[in-house]
Amino acid sequence: MSAYRTKADRDTLSKMNAAVMGGNGDPFYGAPCVAVVLVDKTIPTCVEDGQPGDGNMLNAAESVGLSACWIHRAKEMFETAEGQALLKKWGVPNAENLRGVGNCILGYAADGGKKAPAPRKENYVVLVK
């Protein structure tokens, strides 16, 4: 995992992510920090291995009072020449063998920005005996 807090790096990552969608907005919702989960794509279960890392960051952030959100499209971001150049610039080893799994944005929610949890669905979990 690599975390980026400089405004320039964060803004570059945001623009790359928006470009994947064909837009120019801020898919990172103004969050000041982005942690990118990267995995070794030569390992057959690399995506499955990397996804819990993003999920754990989401849970850890909430536990210390931060807000966090998983932002998809990391795979597409780092398949580009720009993505590969960034990894090399940042000194990430074996950049050519890495695949993006997810972007975890971190920050503090705006006042009133946190929604109440959705009501739990009844009979959603089925216990098989």
Give a label for each model feature:
Residues 1-129:
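Acidic, surface-exposed loops and disordered segments
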